[in-house]
Every structure is written in C-alpha cells, then in structure tokens.
Amino acid sequence: MRPFVTDARRVVVKVGSSSLTTAAGGLDVDRLEALVAAVLPRAGQQLVLVSSGAIAAGLAPLGLARRPRDLATQQAAASVGQSSLVHSYAAAFGRAGHQVGQVLLTATDVIRRTHYRNARTALDRLLELDVIPIINENDAVATQEIRVGDNDRLAAIVAHLVSADLLVLLSDVDGLYDANPRLGPATMVREVRSDTDLDGLTARGTGTAGVGVGGMATKIEAARMAASGGVTAIITSAANAAPVLRGEEVGTVFHPTGSRRASRLLWLAHATAPEGRLHLDSGAVAAVVRRRASLLPAGITGVEGDFAAGDPVDLVDPDGRSVARGLVAFDAAELPVMLGRSTADLAMELGPSYEREIVHRDDLVLLLPAR
C-alpha cells in the first residue's frame, strides 16, 4: 500500500477523452458512470476532477466524424459537448450523494495574479462546501495563442492551485514503460525520483486515443510539473482508477522533486511559449538569478519580439541562454527608450508610471539554477 495515497486529503484526478467516449467519438455514459464510481472520495477526502471530453462529446451531436483541426469548430464542439458532459457527471455523482460544480479555466486564469487569486478562492470555497469541482479548459473562448493546450498540464496547475496532496493522471495506458508495450516487450517504470530516471525513454505512440490531444509525453510533462512543485503524481489507466486511489501499487509514481510554489509560476516555466526576449547585461543577470530581484530597465541591453504588457518573455544572459521567464510590464514598443536607464530618470522624463520594474520578481521564474 502507498500511505501517501491513503493519507491524501485533497486529490486531483484527471481523466482523458479516450476514457469517456465511444469509438465513434460520442460520450459513453456507461464509462463515465464507472469512472465516477471508482473515484468517489472517501470520508474526509476532497476531490477535484479535471475532465477532458467536452469536444469529443460534441462531435456526434454536430455530425462530425472526427475531432476537428480548426479552433473555431473545436470551440463549437466544446460548447455543445460541455453541457452534456457536466450533466452526466452531475447525475452520476448525485446518485452517490455528491454535488458537483462546473469550473472552466483559461490560461489567463492561472497566470494573471488577480485571476489566479480569484480562481484559487473559488475552488477552495467549493471544496469547503463539499462540492466536487469538475474542471476543464474553457475551449469555447480560449485563443490559439494563449491556452493551456491539454488537460494534463491543466491538472498539474490545478493541483498546485488547490494545494493538493496527490495528482492522478488517468488515460488508456496503465503506466510509463521503457518502450511501447503495444509493439513488443516492455518494462513499466514504477517510480520516478528525478529526471535521470527518464533518460532514454520514449513517450510516443503509447496510447490509442483519437479524440484527445494529450499523449504520454504530455502526461510525463504534467507529472514533472506537479513533482517539481512538491505534489506527488501518478500516471495510470482509467481502469486502475479504483485500485490506485485505494493505495494499491499500480501505475508510475513521480515523487516530489521540489518545494511548493505558486501555480502560475509553474505555468510560466512549463506551459508558456515566450512572446519575446529581453537581453540582459551580467549585472542584471546576477540580480535576477542570484538575488531574486526584479528586472529594471538599467540592466536591459536589447529587446526581441512584438509583445504586449502582461505577456511572458524570456530573460537572456550575454551568452544567449534563457535564464528566467516573466510577465513583462510594458509593451515591446515602449522599451527601446528605456534601455540602460534608471527608473528615476525615466520618471522625470516620461512620467511616474515609468518608475517601476520591467518584470516584477513576483512574476518571474528561473529557468536555470543560480550559480
């Protein structure tokens, strides 16, 4: 038995589209009800369910034979399918005496400070009221440029958002193998304690899903995200949902490799693509990396990209290495006149709104360790 599972009081479970849908792509209510029966929380335990399946559930009603490739049709399918998905969850959990609440998140909700606080407060209150949050990315409004992109990473972010004790990633594969078990002999990797345990492994082609976007590679990345922030994660199949939550030794465990930190910083480090780059001198690199200071304009030597205030940008050292990533406080077009200058000088010339950081330390995450 695994005491870190049986002792967990707040658990996030993620289920993929392939575990909830028929071969034709529609919602399989029987499979959904079986999943609900398997993940019902124990007395004193709180459950958060991150569920894919909205787009897949919308395919059949819209007469679509397969998952659409264009964002607009995906959003239409999500809009149609989400209501059906949550209605089915509400009915299944309701028969067991549990209330559910729908929560749709976008990347903005976990990266902007005010959105992040509001999302965390809302989820905490739902759990305090003994409600099971059913979470999905808000596919109907998320843009291609700023979206989480798969529910595996969203689940890892949510696990930190709610300070979960455990993250369980369910799919159609019962764990991580050293080769594709469908193509030949393979050995399951039972435990991952560091990235070196993943050396030489391939994660392509290990699933059968045709209606989702998450494969084994995204599950590994999500488990690493969770572990790097102090949350234990397990990858296993939906068929193993009940055994894994009972503490049986199934699936692959990713043990914590770091301490807990804000979910939005994990999102910055693992799930964002930078919109630009700020080149720093050696003094600014030392301030940001070693002293964990905010980035001031005096230490910036160059700007790349066409970004807006609030976008993620990489901070680059004189050797061209990205040492940190943060949310920039100014548009790219505003920065050239600010480079290499003190905030006091800028305030005198351009006004008091320029007497502030380019990237605040609270909006910054290191990509390389301090040396």
From Swiss-Prot:
Domain of life: Bacteria
UniProt keyword Nucleotide-binding present: yes
GO MF annotation, one: RNA binding
Subcellular compartments: Cytoplasm
GO biological process: L-proline biosynthetic process
Residue positions binding ATP: 14, 171-172
InterPro entries: AceGlu_kinase-like_sf, Asp/Glu/Uridylate_kinase, G5K_ProB, Glu/AcGlu_kinase, Glu_5kinase, Glu_5kinase/COase_Synthase, Glutamate_5-kinase_CS, PUA
Enzyme Commission designation: 2.7.2.11
Ranges where the PUA domain occurs: 275-353
UniProt keyword annotation of Coiled coil present: no
Pathway this chain belongs to: Amino-acid biosynthesis; L-proline biosynthesis; L-glutamate 5-semialdehyde from L-glutamate: step 1/2
One Gene Ontology cellular component annotation held by this UniProt entry: cytosol
Main location class: cytoplasm
Family in the record: Belongs to the glutamate 5-kinase family.
Functional summary from the UniProt entry: Catalyzes the transfer of a phosphate group to glutamate to form L-glutamate 5-phosphate.
Protein name (record): Glutamate 5-kinase
Upper classification of the organism: Bacteria, Bacillati, Actinomycetota, Actinomycetes, Frankiales
